[in-house]
């Protein structure tokens, strides 16, 4: 290989760097960078790797708690769940690659998140996939959706990790910018925790896994740190999408865990965004050391690759292990047994420099202080302002003119919103390891928590929920995000679990737009307030910006993955069916208290707003309107009470009220439980029309199926903790009948069989055909 000549300052623009950033690089180096050095800075200072637009805002999130072993900044968050057991959790986005190449974009998102988990020393036990695509009646959106689902199932099923929970949302805001967020969980003994650090000078850097190719070069800057515009062909960006091999990943998982169990590795890092540049600089910077990398030692799958390509390739299924010289032979032996390639490509130095060499002692091709790549990326305080029309939008009432909606129209609106997402999750194997107690399709998933040393059940459960709501956050990013966090906690409560920690994926548009930065800042404040109210930390996350096409940004879409613990898992907290005669009750705080998040309490006679509701967006095509006020203390008290009531068997079946309001939630309970219902709902405000009572989405409400003999006791216990218990009706019969208290007749009166048919068939019928590679 030949030396790289110094660059002219114009090349930095093509690599995604600004003029001030280029000047800062020259200051840090006290010279001009050469081509290779400039490329390394470009990928590490990209939005995807550096969080340069969001870092100062993310610092406001609560990240500390007694359970936190590892918080943000490492490959994954790690929390102590007791008994010497730790859970690693992480969420990432693969939005831009999935818009270009849906199958590989989604598949490699799965592979990347799994490496983040076992890098910490944890065995991956579960995946979660909150997905968002454009309208399914449009061919391109349908093609993207099929490719994404196929990619996740093809990789996850093959690598042997179950996909246990997720979301599937179709909306026009994601027409050109689908969101593929993927979360993963792993379990390990607390003593096996390993960090991505190179602390011991003289240790060797061992590259393990797949060979290095040209796939994914520049992915963090070409795709993840820029939007899409007309005139840019997808094919031009397709080489920046990585290609995955789940069978290579499976072998890599087993090899890495075996060497970690044997104590042969002092630090380990996956090669994700920015490839070897990121892995080498991050491990060195975190460890306060330096590293020399020999690019001629890197196994290549394509001929003629140059140092720039080798150092920035994002080829999948690769890990960089920090190994003392005396342990290298044992590491190689383990890798050979698992048919994993292992090659020494560098060594740890004590001078803090990252050097790229042509040969172990050959010419220096790049010489950069490692910390400047990892720690010295710029941090921007970008301008922020709310949209100019925000105040006017909040004054709109989507229900205007809906006072005389007929029962037939109410029923039609409900059926149009009714769709069981379980069809998507049946493409995935969610029963691997036989740990799944409550599977996908319910409010949360519940897993048996096993001792990672012996594999024996602990008698406790690990609950997982994923939630996001772009409609709420478009109406009010701060309050909407707080509602999302509370909904996630409510979902855990519905399976009897108390929240422990969360990770977030913040999906937004172009950060150079002040309105987008305002949305992001408000989102972080809302998440902070809700987490503080729940008493839980944020232990990691991801920020995906530049989700825009032709200057049009997606609706702000923060997504959370929350975990909780069920302390005594002695029964399955979700029945297979609802028994006729079971009572339907509503559990919630008595009313929204004054002085809580984002605004004063409206008088009780005022109608609950319909802004941000699914009914307003999908049935009235109205994105305007105010959100309901959220009573954080009341919602937290309700979640805690519901979790305890489920565990104590006072509640047989619980379901939170969120998308689609209480009308849709009741219909979903009927469909899942196979029972009709006769229910009367208290009006939400004086003279509230049917659509407001049925479809408004005030947070902090849970529906519960209760045995008749337990209702009075449930009400007494609820009252003692400030939660109201309202009897709404009774399950049974062959019709779904929902009306307003004090009003004659029913606003919704549907045959149960027709309702179930719509619920089960809506999503499969939206796809053009069977999904390739779907699980049987």
Regions found by a protein language model. Name each.
Residues 149, 194-196, 421-424, 693-695:
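Short histidine-centered beta-strand/loop micro-motifs
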Residues 3-4, 9-80:
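N-terminal amphipathic, basic-rich helices that act as targeting or association modules
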Residues 45, 49, 58-108, 112-114, ...:
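Non-catalytic terminal/interface segments that mediate subunit docking, oligomerization
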Residues 74-340, 349-353, 357, 380, ...:
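Mobile "lid/hinge" segments at catalytic clefts and subdomain interfaces of large enzymes
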Residues 3-15, 19-21, 27-38, 176-178, ...:
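Glycine-/charge-enriched secondary-structure boundary and capping motifs
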């Amino acid at each position: 290989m030949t030396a790289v000549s110094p660059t002219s300052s114009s090349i930095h623009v093509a690599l995604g760097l600004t003029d001030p950033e280029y000047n800062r690089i020259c200051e840090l180096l006290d010279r001009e960078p050469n081509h290779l050095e400039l490329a390394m800075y470009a990928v590490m200072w990209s939005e995807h790797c550096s969080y340069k637009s969001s870092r100062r805002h993310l610092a406001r999130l609560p990240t500390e708690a007694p359970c936190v072993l590892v918080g943000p900044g490492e490959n994954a968050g790690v929390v102590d769940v007791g008994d010497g057991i730790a859970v690693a959790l992480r969420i990432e986005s693969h939005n831009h690659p999935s818009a270009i190449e849906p199958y590989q974009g989604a598949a490699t998102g799965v592979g990347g998140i799994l490496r983040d988990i076992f890098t910490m020393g944890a065995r991956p036990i579960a995946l979660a996939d909150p997905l968002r695509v454009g309208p399914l009646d449009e061919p391109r959106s349908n093609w993207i959706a099929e490719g994404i689902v196929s990619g996740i199932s093809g990789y996850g099923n093959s690598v042997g990790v179950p996909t246990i929970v997720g979301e599937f949302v179709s909306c026009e805001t994601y027409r050109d910018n689908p969101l593929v967020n993927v979360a993963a969980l792993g379990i390990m003994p607390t003593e096996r925790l390993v960090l991505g650090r190179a602390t011991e000078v003289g240790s060797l850097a061992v590259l393990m896994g797949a060979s290095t190719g040209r796939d994914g070069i520049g992915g963090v800057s070409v795709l993840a740190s820029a939007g899409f515009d007309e005139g840019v062909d997808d094919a031009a960006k397709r080489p920046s999408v990585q290609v995955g091999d789940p069978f290579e990943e499976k072998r890599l998982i087993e090899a890495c865990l075996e060497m970690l169990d044997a104590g042969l590795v002092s630090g380990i890092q996956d090669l994700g965004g920015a490839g070897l540049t990121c892995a080498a600089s991050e491990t060195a910077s975190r460890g306060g050391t330096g590293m020399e990398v020999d690019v001629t030692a890197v196994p290549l799958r394509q001929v003629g690759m140059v140092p720039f390509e080798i150092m920035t390739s994002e080829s999948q299924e690769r890990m960089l292990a920090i190994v003392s010289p005396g342990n290298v032979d044992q590491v190689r032996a383990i890798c050979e047994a698992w048919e994993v390639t292992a090659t020494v490509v560098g060594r740890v130095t004590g001078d803090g420099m990252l050097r790229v060499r042509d040969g172990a002692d050959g010419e220096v091709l790049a010489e950069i202080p490692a910390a400047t790549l990892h720690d010295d990326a710029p941090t921007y305080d970008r301008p922020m302002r709310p949209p100019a029309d925000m105040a006017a939008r909040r004054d709109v009432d989507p229900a205007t003119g809906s006072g005389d909606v007929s029962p037939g129209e109410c029923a039609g609106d409900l059926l149009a919103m009714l769709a069981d997402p379980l069809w998507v999750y049946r493409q995935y194997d969610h029963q691997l390891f036989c740990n799944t107690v409550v599977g996908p399709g319910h409010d949360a998933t519940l897993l048996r928590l096993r001792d990672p040393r012996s594999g024996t059940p602990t008698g406790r459960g690990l609950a997982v929920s994923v939630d996001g709501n772009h409609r709420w956050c478009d109406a009010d990013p701060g309050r909407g995000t707080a509602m999302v966090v509370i909904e996630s906690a409510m979902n855990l409560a519905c399976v009897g679990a108390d929240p422990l920690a969360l990770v977030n994926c913040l999906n937004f548009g172009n950060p150079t737009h002040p309105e987008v930065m305002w949305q992001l800042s408000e989102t972080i404040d809302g998440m902070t307030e809700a987490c503080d109210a729940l008493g839980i930390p944020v232990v990691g996350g991801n920020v995906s910006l530049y989700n825009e096409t032709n200057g049009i940004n997606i609706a702000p879409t923060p997504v959370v993955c929350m975990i909780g613990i069920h302390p005594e898992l002695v029964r399955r907290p979700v029945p297979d069916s609802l028994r006729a005669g079971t009572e339907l009750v509503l559990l919630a705080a008595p009313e929204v208290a004054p002085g809580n998040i984002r605004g004063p309490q409206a008088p009780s006679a005022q109608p609950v707003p319909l802004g941000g509701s699914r009914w307003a967006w999908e049935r009235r095509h109205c994105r305007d309107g105010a959100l309901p006020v959220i009573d954080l203390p009341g919602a937290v008290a309700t979640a805690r009470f519901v979790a305890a009531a489920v565990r104590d068997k006072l509640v047989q079946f619980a379901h939170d009220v969120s998308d689609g309001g209480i009308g849709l939630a009741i219909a979903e309970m009927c469909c899942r439980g196979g029972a009709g219902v006769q229910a009367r709902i208290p009006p939400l405000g004086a003279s509230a029309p049917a659509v407001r009572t049925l479809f408004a989405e005030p947070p902090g409400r849970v529906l519960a199926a209760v045995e008749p003999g337990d209702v009075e006791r449930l009400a007494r216990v609820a009252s003692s903790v400030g939660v109201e218990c309202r009897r709404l009706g009774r399950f049974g019969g062959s019709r779904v009948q929902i009306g307003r208290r004090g009003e004659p007749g029913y606003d919704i009166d549907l045959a149960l069989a027709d309702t179930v048919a719509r619920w089960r068939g809506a999503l499969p019928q939206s796809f053009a055909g069977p999904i390739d590679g779907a699980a049987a």
